[in-house]
Amino acid sequence: MRELTYVARRTAEWREAPDPVLQSDSDAIVAPVAAAPCDVDSAILAGHGPIPPPFAIGHECVARVVDAGESSRFSPGNLVVVPWAISCGTCDRCAGGLTTHCTSVPHMAMFGAPIGGSWGGLFSDLVRIPWADAMLVPLPGGLDPMAMASASDNWPLAWRLVAPHLRARPGARVLVIARGSIGLYVCDIARALGASDVLYVDPDPAHRAIAEGYGARTAAEIEPVHHGFDLAVESTGRVPELVTALRSLAPEGFCESAGNHFRPGELPLLEMYLTGVTLRVARDNVRAHLPQALELAASGQVDPGRVVSGVFDWEQLPEVLPERHLKPVFVRADQPVGR
């Protein structure tokens, strides 16, 4: 089989690899049918990642099961979402919802980067899934795999960034400072779940147009809005934008930072102390809340397909992926996306 390999800045190529095989009765082998780059993949391809190449890239896809161990509940033909992080489902951390911190594997074991071992990437023709029953989530009927190609990471992350807060604070005012798909998904979910105001900040006019289609107000840039928002979501990976988000919070407000901050920076700690805000900077325990996120997607209240910036053939991955796109989706001619 082939796996797409990141080899240098803005360069990826197909490389041959052995076909994966079942290593236990709980494994499954899947073939991605619709896959998308995560926002962090764009940073990696631009040369900003912390890990030098080469390595198999990709950690967002909807896949079709092609083989499964005898103890698995999955069967060939099932359409599934593959969470980005490897988790066993039974250790103490997994049982507590901390699936990104599973103790059965090295810390931060994941698809798409050789952190915590080498698990391959989801831009591969075939992928072995350990603990398939714990990891894989069936794609609900009626959902388009192309629209949900990001359900491994960015889509459920956006759900986690806003949905629990709006449950605790109905009608909250939401600030989104973004540079990619995560912030746009947040706008859609926040609107669907009853935010009283959503302001989306992004210098890209095409991104702002999508946010406006979701019912958000937009701006190319802003100065801090004193006590303006109950929740701020920052997904730029830029510390000045994170500082703006923090300085725009109402007393006891909450800031979710979903940007990958590869560079250090200084935060307004005294202002944060005086306002009593909470800042969370965290990777997502996606498997724990993926079913709830997919339930919202299946309800028809949201439209993640609007964020898809183009649909491309699987064979175009090496040429198209390194280009600048918001959320391209790559589909397999040999693995139809229909059920």
Predicted features, each with a name:
Residues 224-232:
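A short acidic, Gly/Pro-enriched loop at the edge of an enzyme's catalytic core
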Residues 1-3, 287-339:
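C-terminal hydrophobic helical "lid"/dimerization subdomain
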Residues 74-75, 168, 249:
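Short, well-ordered loop/turn sites that connect or cap secondary structure elements
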Residues 1-62, 124-127, 131, 333-339:
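Short N-terminal strand-loop motif that marks the start
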Residues 79, 138-221:
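Mid-domain Rossmann-like dinucleotide-binding core that forms the NAD(H)/NADP(H) cofactor-binding site
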Residues 90-177:
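NAD(P)H dinucleotide-binding glycine-rich loop of Rossmann-like/cofactor-binding domains
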Residues 195, 239-299, 332-339:
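Glycine-rich phosphate-binding loop and adjacent beta-alpha segment
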